[in-house]
Structure formats: structure tokens, C-alpha cells
């Protein structure tokens, strides 16, 4: 694996998140419905847009991402963001899965008043993202300010017919979480 510095890896991960989750058109690529982008085209379009991108750099980002944000297709010719999409081009078909009794959502304290009114909503994303453990949820919440971890009564939701999915990186997904299923 080629050597790359931490800043280069972080910048590349942010760039990939932007184009593979939100704005593929920013560099002229098209994602299929499952979110896959042809790697050769991605590299070419990124370079035309002034972003240094190589297969070796992609390999390092995919292999070392602590959150496993990206994955390669089985033939190694395509890459995608595992979850977190806001672009309407993508509708990944996750298999429905029964959740554990509780899941966790990390947020910033400044969002609590709104959450207490409307619950958790996907916003610009396709799904509400939930963590299997409190520590991960706390890290997520800390990205946005003073972290707060909410407990989601996931099994109770599932028993009421609300579906859950789990992305290949372990992130749990659901469409919304009503206030009644949250513990503060």
C-alpha cells in the first residue's frame, strides 16, 4: 500500500464523500441506483476537476477508513459510499434486518429542542443513521458540537412494523424515529 499523509487521506475521504454521496455531477460522474461509480472514470473526472486522485490513494482511503465509508465492487472496478447519500440518483437496496433492543443516535445539544418536537428525521439524507453502541454515537455527536446520545427503542419500533436496515459498515438505518421511541 502506498504511503500517504493523514491530511491527504482526510481530504480525499471528504472529496469522495462529497461526490459519491451528494454531488457526483460536480465532477461529471454518474452513479448507478446502488451508488456505484466506475473507478477509472472517477479518477479521470477528479483529475480534470483539479483533484489529485490515483488508484493507490483510493486503495489506501478504502482500506484505512475507520468508519468504512467506502467499498469496492466484487470485481474491483467500481467504488461507492456505503451509506449517507442525499443524491436522488442513488437508492441502495439494503436488506431489512431486525435491530437490537436499543440503538443510539449522536447529536449536538443545540439540536435537542427540535428533536423533542419532531423526533429524528433524515433531513437531506435518505435515512436516519443510528449506532449500535453509545461510544460511536458520542463520536458522531461530537462532530457537530457538544455531544448528546439519545437511546432509540429499536425493537419496539420494529415490533410496530417500522423497518430497519444495516449498511455493510455496521451503521443502522431507518426512515424516521418518532419522539415516543426516544429516551433522553
UniProtKB/Swiss-Prot annotation:
Disulfide bonds: none
Domain of life: Bacteria
Single biological process term from Gene Ontology: tRNA splicing, via endonucleolytic cleavage and ligation
Gene Ontology molecular function: NAD+ poly-ADP-ribosyltransferase activity; tRNA 2'-phosphotransferase activity
Entry keywords, A to Z: NAD, Transferase
Annotated EC: 2.7.1.-
Enzyme class label: transferase
Similarity comment: Belongs to the KptA/TPT1 family.
Role this protein plays: Removes the 2'-phosphate from RNA via an intermediate in which the phosphate is ADP-ribosylated by NAD followed by a presumed transesterification to release the RNA and generate ADP-ribose 1''-2''-cyclic phosphate (APPR>P). May function as an ADP-ribosylase.
Protein name: Probable RNA 2'-phosphotransferase
Lineage: Bacteria, Pseudomonadati, Pseudomonadota, Gammaproteobacteria, Enterobacterales
Chain's gene name: kptA
Amino acid at each position: 500500500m502506498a504511503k500517504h499523509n493523514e491530511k491527504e487521506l482526510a481530504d480525499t475521504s471528504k472529496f469522495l464523500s462529497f461526490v459519491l454521496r451528494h454531488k457526483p455531477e460536480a465532477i461529471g460522474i454518474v452513479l448507478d441506483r446502488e451508488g456505484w461509480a466506475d473507478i477509472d472514470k472517477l479518477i479521470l473526472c477528479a483529475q480534470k476537476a483539479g483533484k489529485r486522485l490515483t488508484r493507490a490513494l483510493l486503495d489506501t482511503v478504502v482500506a484505512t477508513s475507520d468508519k468504512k465509508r467506502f467499498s469496492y465492487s466484487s470485481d474491483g472496478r467500481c467504488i461507492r459510499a456505503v451509506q449517507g447519500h442525499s443524491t436522488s440518483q442513488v437508492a441502495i437496496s439494503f436488506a431489512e434486518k431486525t435491530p437490537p433492543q436499543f440503538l443510539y443516535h449522536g447529536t449536538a445539544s443545540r439540536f435537542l429542542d427540535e428533536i423533542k418536537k419532531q423526533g429524528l428525521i433524515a433531513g437531506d439524507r435518505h435515512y436516519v443513521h443510528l449506532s449500535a453502541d453509545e461510544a460511536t454515537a458520542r463520536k458522531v455527536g461530537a462532530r457537530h458540537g457538544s455531544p448528546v446520545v439519545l437511546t432509540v427503542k429499536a425493537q419496539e419500533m420494529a415490533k410496530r412494523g417500522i423497518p430497519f436496515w444495516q449498511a455493510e459498515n455496521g451503521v443502522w438505518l431507518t426512515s424516521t424515529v418518532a419522539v415516543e421511541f426516544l429516551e433522553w
